Amino acid sequence: MEAENIRADAFEPAKRATKRGASGGGQQDVEMQVDEATGIEGQVLGSSRASAPPKAKRARSELRKVSVPPHRYSSLKEHWMKIFTPVVEHMKLQIRFNMKARQVELRVGPETPDIANLQRGADFVRAFLCGFEVDDALALLRLEDLFVESFEIKDVKTLRGDHQSRAIGRLAGKGGRTKFTIENVTKTRIVLADSKIHILGSYQNIQLARRAVCNLILGSPPSKVYGNLRAVASRLSERM
């Protein structure tokens, strides 16, 4: 067999395939916004999406069920229209309260623009049932990357009887002043439900608020916690 002549100058360097996804084009600037109605900070809705969301598929399996605790029945009935209106008109979801199962059920409708609205609607209802005001929980529908983190006092330190009551008192402060200060500095919302604590906000802000709450539970004086919070908040504002 005759050897075939190979021209070395005819070869071109191989092209490296570009990676798809968020890591391919470097870091993207995330636009943060403080909701004027609630003061909660989060990512601007739609700022992380490169294109318009696809039309949601109509499927009966796309359903979310949120159990209603017994002590929130009356509050749910009282504020039902405030919950129903944004979920149906803005999220374009179908919602109902199943009286027999004691659950709020949400389902994708024919006009739902984004399948992610179903999870956000369920998070909104779940936040209200945790004890947040409707206006505060609405931030979950207005802004992206907001979460509700829940934990108990015993997760931080085992306290019983009067010791636990004093810890709850330190968290609230006189007239709720300590809780309001932590909320304003960290741009979050906090609910003290007996021994359970719920924090609504962005991931970074939740960590700040949780650190302050844990320090108070462990016995740190409020003045020291305020100082640490303001120092961290000022450093974060300089970075932004």
Swiss-Prot record:
It holds the Pfam family KH_PNO1_2nd. Residues 1-15 have a biased composition (Basic and acidic residues). CDD domains: KH-I_PNO1_rpt1, KH-I_PNO1_rpt2. Residues 1-61 are annotated as: Disordered. The keyword ATP-binding does not apply. Keywords: Nucleus, RNA-binding. Residues 164-213 form the KH domain. It is found in: Nucleus, Nucleolus. GO terms for cellular component: nucleolus; nucleus. GO terms for molecular function: RNA binding. Belongs to the PNO1 family. This is RNA-binding protein pno1. The gene is l(1)G0004.
